[in-house]
């Protein structure tokens, strides 16, 4: 790996002034075309012809080039530069403006275009742009393609006026389209160099199957709903064709139960849901409408073997061909607590779609067994034995191996339209436990930190926070409001002081997560951050503090907020993770504060600047966020497409696309609808063992619960 790579001249002295993400994507796009100079005269002539034809309201200009043609892209680029409109040349596209903010056809400007002066200005602008952008020296500025109903939009047409600023209005639609272009660059590279592979290595431009033959569809299935949300119909059809002809789960291959559930099962279920919900996504062949659901059911039936443990807690992995579950090959054979308890959204939605109670029963049995352990203050150790249903060790953290247990508590409550209050009760208990035992403040700037207890609740406080923890601030806001705007939530009769405090906690934790980005040389967050605390540490349970810094300025001599962060070499890698931008999406939609969008835009620019791969390889995770340029790890995570870019696209888009009060995202960002479980006669099939005033299980009730837990759940 060449750590000094600079394929787009991004790191020369002149470029250290942080070029925008648009300009960087444009430079990447420049490498994909070669006909701009030769097409200059043709573009001018085509423009003249379009002017002459403008009297015909529905006339298509003569000599319309193919949408794939560089001439077409060049013409659209020129048109957008001259008119200031992001659309391509008029009458080239047939897609009208639709819902969810999808862009439509261009509107004519016939009054201006009929004049000779207008024609002359356009021709002059064409030549001026050629000189300004350096096309006369052999460069191009053509941009990336969109879907087949919306092609011809050059990237350059999207960068005009996009940067915004304090004195100008930000064009969030242009920023959203920039995210779409980043996705297309990533997807196009994968299509060209790694199609069908479960792993894609953008630097070496190779891939690898997780299972032979044809793999698991790890990247394709995980990205399905992002393709749908971005309305990329051409790319979606390619993916659908591959799934139809090549995806087969009848493999003698052991797979991780959790990862396969959240990525593959979740991706297929979400694709089925969105195909029925968003316009224009159903396949042309009606016989293929249930294909995603059929694949999901086949996969789920194979995963059922993982739940056939003595306790009901799923085995860490399962062999797909025969459905045989297997214990973890590490951690003393124990399963990850988060992995065992983050399967419920997927299984419950599948049960609702199919009417098959077995999926519901298996999923909720896990929750009962885990809760029957009576973890103190709702804080669970991060490992659990599948055969015994008891915890291994007492390490507590909301990061790796703990995170999504807490996430799925409140999301289960919301998924079934608040019909299962037991999960809200468990969420509240766990959040209060975190406030009591884990929440602390940094020494200098009082940033709020969710620390860890490696030796249990009574052990020492470890000032470490995984990036994975950054799901929490958005989830707190979601739990507090139910996903409706804050202004509406405050009108609810249940709103009070506690809810205001929780929203403030969400704001402060979001700020800490953003600090993980702003503190590094690249503007990308490390995998893990450590923090400077007081000795003894100030705790949230004794006093609620507001951070002293706005993260935009720092005090010299190391006394500012940056000195509160300690990024260790072993933790300095960035894996393109989505947790922070997920929280930004929730915080923006719930509070309406533009700062969360602005922070998201800064993150996106940093990803584009520092993780883009030369020769149209796409984007890669990096090894050190404090090195410029950061060494590339030569891997594109599937959640870069499934989560990170999806959340950014939604963050910059309209709020009525996947409203937070109508859907829940699983932990892989696959959206599921909230549904009325009672319509399928589903309900919670278990009850919690009562706790005493100290939060301990009532002994006499434990025996009763043990006796009933061995009986099948009746729904």
State each model region's role.
Residues 2-31, 36, 43, 48-715:
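Glycan-recognition and catalytic cores of secretory/periplasmic carbohydrate-active enzymes
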């Amino acid at each position: 790996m060449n750590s000094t790579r600079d394929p787009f001249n991004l790191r020369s002295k002149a470029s250290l002034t942080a070029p925008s993400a648009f300009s960087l994507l444009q430079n990447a796009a420049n490498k994909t075309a070669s006909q701009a100079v030769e097409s200059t005269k043709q573009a001018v002539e085509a423009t003249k012809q379009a002017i002459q034809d403008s009297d015909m309201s529905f006339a298509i200009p003569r000599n319309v080039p193919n949408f794939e043609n560089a001439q077409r892209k060049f013409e659209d680029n020129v048109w957008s530069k001259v008119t200031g409109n992001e659309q391509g040349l008029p009458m080239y596209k047939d897609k009208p403006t639709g819902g969810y903010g999808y862009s439509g056809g261009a509107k004519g400007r016939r009054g201006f275009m009929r004049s000779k002066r207008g024609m002359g200005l356009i021709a002059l602008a064409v030549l001026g742009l050629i000189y300004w952008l350096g096309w006369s020296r052999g460069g191009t500025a053509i941009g990336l393609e969109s879907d087949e109903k919306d092609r011809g939009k050059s990237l350059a047409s999207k960068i005009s006026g996009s940067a915004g600023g304090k004195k100008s209005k930000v064009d969030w639609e242009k920023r959203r389209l920039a995210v779409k272009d980043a996705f297309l660059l990533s997807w196009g590279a994968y299509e060209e160099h790694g199609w069908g592979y479960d792993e894609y290595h953008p630097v070496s431009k190779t891939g690898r199957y997780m299972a032979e033959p044809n793999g698991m569809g790890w990247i394709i299935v995980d990205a399905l709903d992002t393709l749908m949300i971005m309305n990329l119909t051409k790319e979606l059809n390619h993916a659908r064709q591959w799934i139809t002809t090549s995806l087969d789960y009848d493999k003698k291959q052991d797979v991780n139960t959790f990862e396969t559930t959240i990525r593959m099962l979740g991706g297929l279920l979400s694709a089925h849901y969105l195909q029925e919900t968003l316009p224009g996504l159903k396949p042309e062949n009606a016989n293929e409408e249930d294909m995603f659901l059929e694949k999901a059911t086949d996969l789920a039936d194979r995963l059922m073997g993982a739940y056939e443990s003595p306790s009901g807690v799923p085995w860490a992995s399962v062999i797909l061909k025969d459905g045989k579950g297997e214990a973890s090959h590490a951690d003393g054979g124990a399963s990850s607590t988060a992995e065992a308890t983050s399967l419920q959204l997927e299984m419950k939605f599948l049960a609702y779609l199919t009417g098959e109670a077995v999926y519901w029963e298996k999923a909720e049995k896990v929750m009962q067994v885990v809760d029957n352990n009576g973890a103190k203050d709702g804080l669970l150790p991060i490992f659990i034995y599948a055969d015994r249903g008891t915890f291994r060790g007492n390490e507590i953290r909301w990061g790796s191996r703990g995170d999504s247990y807490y996430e799925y508590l409140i999301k289960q409550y919301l998924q079934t339209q608040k019909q299962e209050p037991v999960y809200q009760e468990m969420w509240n208990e766990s959040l209060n436990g975190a406030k009591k035992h884990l929440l602390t403040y940094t020494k200098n700037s009082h940033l709020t930190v969710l620390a860890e207890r490696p030796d249990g609740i009574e052990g020492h406080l470890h000032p470490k926070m995984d990036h994975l923890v950054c799901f929490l601030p958005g989830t707190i806001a979601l739990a507090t409001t139910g996903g409706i705007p804050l202004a509406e939530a405050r009108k609810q009769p249940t709103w009070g002081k506690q809810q205001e405090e929780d929203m403030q906690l969400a704001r402060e934790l979001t700020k800490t997560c953003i600090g993980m980005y702003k503190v590094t040389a690249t503007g990308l967050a490390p995998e893990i951050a450590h923090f400077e605390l007081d000795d003894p540490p100030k705790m949230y349970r004794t006093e609620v503090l507001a951070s002293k810094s706005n993260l935009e300025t720092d005090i010299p001599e190391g006394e500012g907020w940056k000195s509160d962060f300690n990024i260790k070499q072993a933790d300095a890698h960035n894996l393109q993770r989505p947790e922070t931008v997920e929280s930004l999406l929730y915080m923006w939609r719930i509070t309406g504060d533009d700062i969360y969008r602005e922070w998201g835009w800064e993150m996106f620019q940093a990803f584009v600047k520092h993780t883009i791969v030369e020769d149209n390889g796409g984007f890669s995770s990096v090894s050190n966020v404090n090195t410029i340029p950061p060494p590339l790890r030569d891997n594109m995570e599937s959640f870069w497409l499934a989560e990170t870019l999806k959340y950014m696209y939604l963050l910059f888009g309209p709020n009525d696309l996947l409203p937070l009060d109508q859907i829940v995202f699983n932990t892989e960002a696959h959206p599921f609808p909230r549904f009325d479980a009672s319509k399928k006669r589903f309900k919670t099939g278990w009850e919690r063992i009562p706790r005493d005033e100290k939060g301990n299980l009532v002994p006499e009730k434990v025996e009763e619960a043990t006796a009933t837990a061995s009986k099948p759940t009746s729904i």
